[in-house]
């Protein structure tokens, strides 16, 4: 996965041209897999062209959302965290791409599309008068002892919350809500939509909201 600004095109990553035209595009913060060329190819195919840039977000952290995705992981979401600065990525979307992204993110079901305060996100193409957007989880943040859990894979300064790896948070959910062997349970979550949705309902009932 690239660790620098890049251009998504032909289903992969290329260097981002220094004169890339950001005007007219909507900057959308990517806090999980939407930063990866592999995920973007799954969502947009090989014909899409999109800038993906590295950025810093202040007063938020990237934490686990209180639901299980159909591919068997706990998705990420943003949650307020005073004095924290977290590394995020930005997808620069045209009108058609934004509509497609809304569909893949289940806007109105799992997420709402929200504007961040102007200047909260800094990085390539972003200025103090430009507001980036993000997908706010309708399910709330997965909580342990009443506090959200950050993603250990995401770099942050002055982090306020405990941080878990993806496998650790899945094993915690299994310990609290699952039965049988971990792998058997996880396989069932991927293959059984009603069972996964029932678990998501239990997680969201105990979630915390910003």
Model regions and ranges:
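Glycine-aromatic micro-motifs
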Residues: 1-210
